[in-house]
From Swiss-Prot:
PANTHER family: HYALURONIDASE (PTHR11769:SF35). The active site is at E109. It catalyses: Random hydrolysis of (1->4)-linkages between N-acetyl-beta-D-glucosamine and D-glucuronate residues in hyaluronate. Keywords: Allergen, Disulfide bond, Glycoprotein, Glycosidase, Hydrolase, Secreted. It is found in: Secreted. It comes from the Eukaryota. Disulfide bonds join C19-C308, C185-C197. This is Hyaluronidase A. It holds the Pfam family Glyco_hydro_56.
Length: 331
């Protein structure tokens, strides 16, 4: 199905309010056709990101390799009521306006609802889930145990993510809600150094319509790394935007695809993207059917006067001019 033609918007999701103490207000952002929250609030009228909101079950790492359980540790052991109550408290505290009509971003990255995808620092949730079943059924073989662990984990992971989204939508009806980073693609990773998404992940995305059907916006992350070649950086963006657009096209309501983009290299956060990388990654988002870009920044990008000045300079000389060119060309 053809995607609805939408205005291509670029959003500012950078905590530059931290620069106000140095009398740097970043008012120039809006001169470049970039949508910014009024007063440069971080959680504001245009966009609000909520980091690890509520009380999602999770195993939180402590210093000595140990971890502590939060709300049961894994979704199948968690208490949904506690979580949802805390979620609304967080929302009301951070952004009390019930008429919020911007983009609401839930940034939850402790585990993924697809059991297989919990690797790296998420793997403890997988191991913990397997241990729970093994303790219950000591005579079962490894395969049976893993299958059961996977089934339980995925059922309740879905429950937590879905109910959270529904509650967000119910209490902030006019906002466009989505989870940061989804759909995942796992391209340009050490085992998959190609633009195309991991095939298994694409099948798993197809099975996640329960999530995407409830989202008004898809928010793939297209942060690039310096260790990649310039062509690989473009490939990373291409594959991730394409996959999100593919998912959107398969849904009746064709949610918007807004790509999360960071102005520094993910593996070299003191280095701004080159002008060429900015141009090419922005173009790639447009070419592959994206509906916009969310420029993200970390608080550690703006926690000193010199960093604030550097970012402002970069905005005025590189990022801003490219942003206005792209929006004017597309719209």
């Amino acid at each position: 199905s053809e995607r609805p033609k939408r205005v291509f918007n670029i959003y500012w999701n950078v905590p530059t309010f931290m620069c106000h103490q140095y009398d740097l207000y970043f008012d120039e952002v809006t001169n470049f056709n970039i949508k910014r929250n009024s007063k440069d609030d971080f959680q504001g009228d245009k966009i609000a990101i909520f980091y690890d909101p509520g009380e999602f079950p999770a195993l939180l790492s402590l210093k000595d390799g140990k971890y502590k359980k939060r709300n049961g540790g894994v979704p199948q052991e968690g208490n949904i009521t506690i979580h949802l109550q805390k979620f609304i408290e967080n929302l009301d505290k951070i952004y009390p306006n019930r008429n919020f009509s911007g983009i609401g971003v839930i940034d939850f990255e402790r585990w993924r609802p697809i059991f297989r995808q919990n690797w790296g620092n998420m793997k403890i949730h997988k191991n913990f889930s397997i241990d729970l079943v093994r303790n219950e059924h000591p005579t079962w073989n490894k395969k049976m145990i893993e299958l059961e662990a996977s089934k339980r984990f995925e059922k309740y992971a879905r429950f937590f993510m879905e109910e959270t989204l529904k509650l967000a939508k119910k209490t902030r009806k006019q906002a466009d809600w989505g989870y940061y980073g989804y759909p995942y693609c796992f391209n340009m990773s050490p085992n998959n150094l190609v633009p195309e998404c991991d095939v298994t992940a694409m099948h798993e995305n197809d099975k996640m319509s329960w999530l995407f059907n409830n989202q008004n916006v898809l928010l793939p992350s297209v942060y690039v790394r310096q260790e990649l070649t310039p062509d690989q950086r473009i490939g990373l963006v291409q594959g991730r935007v394409k996959e999100a657009v593919r998912i959107s096209n398969n849904l009746k309501h064709s949610p918007k695809v807004l790509s999360y983009w960071w102005y520094v290299y993910q593996d070299e956060t003191n280095t701004f993207l080159t002008e060429t990388d900015v141009k090419k990654t922005f173009q790639e988002i447009v070419i592959n059917g994206g509906d916009g870009i969310i420029i993200w920044g970390s608080s550690s990008d703006v926690n000193s006067l010199s960093k604030c000045k550097r970012l402002q300079d970069y905005l005025l000389t590189v990022l801003g001019p490219i942003a206005i060119n792209v929006t004017e060309a597309v719209n």
